[in-house]
Amino acid sequence: GLVISNDFSPGRSALVSQTERRTNGFRRHFSTNENDFFRGAAATVNWKNLDINLFYSYRKLDGGVDSTIVTSFKTDGLHRLVRDREKMHKVSMQTYGGNVRYATPGLCIGLTALSYSFGNYSIQPDPKPYNLFYFRGNRNLNISVDYLLKNKLIKFYGETALSRNGAVASLNALQLTPASYFSLLLLYRYYDKRYQAFFG
């Protein structure tokens, strides 16, 4: 998705039927990856056609720290060398957010908000040509609206998101299925180069 979790939204696929958004809700972290997960508490409330999901996470990240400046994150999970151990669990990250979704068989609309901060640290990567538009600062906010309209022949779905700096990203798809053996998918992606989403 544009705000959170890459397996949460449309993506590229050889099969047209596999690009539609999947709403898996909260689930256990099974990967050996030490970075792409949350540690904390989550709750889901279902009422008629409305789902409300809220969560809070606090965890420590590995990173290169100079006083109160974080110049890089260490994401390989290895702590074999002294320099690796010096970066271990240096940066605290607090994340909270939620999603409210209204769903019927032909219509689904949701609102997602996510806020995260890095304690007393400021993220300031060393300036390089490839990271000119990376997130810099202590906190960020992402908000998105996702939508799905469908009937037997046509399906329109997508997500449009905004980051704290005002940059927009949007991912939309139109799927036409005139027959059970034939489907056509049009996918439109727009990402402002300034759009910043740590978990998107």
Predicted regions mapped to residue ranges:
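Outer-membrane beta-barrel channel domains
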Residues: G1-G200
